[in-house]
């Protein structure tokens, strides 16, 4: 199974692609999508860069599923709203690419990757490096994307066995494709 992990951000969105075969994780790719070439006020342009970038990643790597970080409520409500819009562009691109989308909080990802939810970014980077046998630490945004993919590799199958649905389940995907399911 191939999983695409996305750490959304309006200026920098991290991504990671991981294959899982049984309990074996294998690194495929990671990096960032940057929108900093545009002015801060060009929100529609930045969202389009994110949408196009995620769509391209889905086409290039052909993942079976995607995992996206859930937005945390920031002290600054404007920042939270902007991050939510960036996240929406990412999720829309994934759904348009016909991918099932699971969502995890940063705390859930840190717990799955490091072992406790209050881990520092440097700890996430180091554990991602170890779990995927990387020669060097990935950047923080890419490490978060990889961490989300790893989280889904470990938690997603268990959720399926327990019958829990991801936020965008098959019925919802059918609705997005133009079908109806009640």
UniProtKB/Swiss-Prot annotation:
Its cofactor is Mg(2+). GO terms for biological process: DNA recombination; DNA repair. SUPFAM superfamilies: Ribonuclease H-like. It is found in: Cytoplasm. GO terms for molecular function: crossover junction DNA endonuclease activity; DNA binding; magnesium ion binding. It comes from Verminephrobacter eiseniae (strain EF01-2). The active site is at 7, 69, 141. It holds the Pfam family RuvC. The gene is ruvC. PANTHER family: CROSSOVER JUNCTION ENDODEOXYRIBONUCLEASE RUVC. Its main location: cytoplasm. It is an enzyme of class 3 (hydrolase). It catalyses: Endonucleolytic cleavage at a junction such as a reciprocal single-stranded crossover between two homologous DNA duplexes (Holliday junction). GO terms for cellular component: cytoplasm; Holliday junction resolvase complex. Mg(2+) 1 binds at residues 7, 141. It comes from the Bacteria. The RuvA-RuvB-RuvC complex processes Holliday junction (HJ) DNA during genetic recombination and DNA repair. Endonuclease that resolves HJ intermediates. Cleaves cruciform DNA by making single-stranded nicks across the HJ at symmetrical positions within the homologous arms, yielding a 5'-phosphate and a 3'-hydroxyl group; requires a central core of homology in the junction. The consensus cleavage sequence is 5'-(A/T)TT(C/G)-3'. Cleavage occurs on the 3'-side of the TT dinucleotide at the point of strand exchange. Mg(2+) 2 binds at residue 69. This is Crossover junction endodeoxyribonuclease RuvC. Binds 2 Mg(2+) ion per subunit. Keywords: Cytoplasm, DNA damage, DNA recombination, DNA repair, DNA-binding, Endonuclease, Hydrolase, Magnesium, Metal-binding, Nuclease.
């Amino acid at each position: 199974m191939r999983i695409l992990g996305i750490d959304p951000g309006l200026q920098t969105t991290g991504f990671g692609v991981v294959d899982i075969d049984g309990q074996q994780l294998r690194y495929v790719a990671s990096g960032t999508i940057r929108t900093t070439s545009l002015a801060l006020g060009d929100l529609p342009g930045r969202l389009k860069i994110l949408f196009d970038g995620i769509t391209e990643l889905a086409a290039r790597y052909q993942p079976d599923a995607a995992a996206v970080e859930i937005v945390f409520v920031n002290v600054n409500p404007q920042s939270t709203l902007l991050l939510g819009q960036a996240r929406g562009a990412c999720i829309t691109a994934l759904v348009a690419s016909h991918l099932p989308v699971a969502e995890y909080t940063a705390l859930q990802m840190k717990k799955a990757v490091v072992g406790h939810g209050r881990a520092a970014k440097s700890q996430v980077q180091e554990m991602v490096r170890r779990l995927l046998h990387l020669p060097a630490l990935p950047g923080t945004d890419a490490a978060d994307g990889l961490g989300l993919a790893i989280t889904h590799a470990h938690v997603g199958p268990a959720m399926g066995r327990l019958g829990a649905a991801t936020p965008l389940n098959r019925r919802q995907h059918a609705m997005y494709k133009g079908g109806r399911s009640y």
